[in-house]
Amino acid sequence: MAGNPANTESHDDDALHRRGLMFILSSPSGAGKTTIARKLLSEDSEIAMSVSVTTRPMRPGEVDGKDYFFVEPAEFERMVEANEFYEWATVFGNCYGTPKAHIRERLKTGGDVLFDIDWQGTQQLYQKAQADVVRVFILPPSLDELRRRLTGRGTDSAEVIAARMDRAQAEISHWDGYDYVVVNDDVDGCFGKVREILAAERMRRTRQTGLIDFVRGLMRG
């Protein structure tokens, strides 16, 4: 027996609904995390960079709500006391925090949020939002290649590069705290793998918020 076209269309619409995810990219400096993040933001309209709340004064050219959410110290303190941050920290006298409400609203409407953070920030987010978090760690093909990339920037002294290399090895030691590990020996190849991870995670059954009703509709005939 033929089904009702109107019902079929409704079920298709339901199946398209999904909950967004918090997509974390981490890597030691020079491994390509920032390049991959920029490519992802420029080529995928469903994901946006996480916007932090800060007490830092707004700089020329910055836009409130785009670069940061700028607040007074008293408001930031209130948000901390109200548990409105996934994580927060004080850096050089200014406070920075990841706001729960803004991110949860985006996830609810099916939008994804990109985080360019280190292993410590990743751990904090995962502890508070495990079901929504996808963790990807990007590795260099070798330490020699990482050193070559850092030196090739031409912006750091030998002492700074040495410090970055030491820090890189410390960060790499936390690779097993991630869901996926990708070796960046080629930017395009690495980017392709990261996009495949994102696409697969978007299709997880637990994120398909309209799937239950869709399947029930199919079973009713």
From Swiss-Prot:
Catalysed reactions, as listed in the record: GMP + ATP = GDP + ADP
Residues engaged in binding ATP: S27, P28, S29, G30, A31, G32, K33, T34
Gene name of the encoded protein: gmk
Subcellular compartments: Cytoplasm
Residues of the Guanylate kinase-like domain: 20-199
Listed name of the protein: Guanylate kinase
GO function terms (MF aspect): ATP binding; guanylate kinase activity
Principal cellular location given in the protein's record: cytoplasm
